[in-house]
Amino acid sequence: MKLTCVVIVAVLFLTAWTFVMADDSRYGLKDLFPKARHEMKNPEASKLNKRDECFSPGTFCGIKPGLCCSAWCYSFFCLTLTF
């Protein structure tokens, strides 16, 4: 019985982790290569790492980690991790 509960909790945790860490399709690779080519011609014009609308650390991000500027949404809040 205990083993069954542990397995169920582990599966639920891994499923939730997969959904939280999944990439948002809005920031996919569809425009990455043309922008990268333009970046090679003019490195100052690079906007690949900038997002128009992102939340600063400490703000509520819900379940969409792509909305955080730092791309880390943990427990529904944007985080900034420094190593």
From Swiss-Prot:
One of its GO terms (cellular component) is extracellular region. Its main location: secreted. It holds the Pfam family Conotoxin. The keyword Secreted applies. It is found in: Secreted. The modification 4-hydroxyproline is found at residues 57, 65. Belongs to the conotoxin O1 superfamily. This is Delta-conotoxin-like Ac6.1. It comes from Conus achatinus.
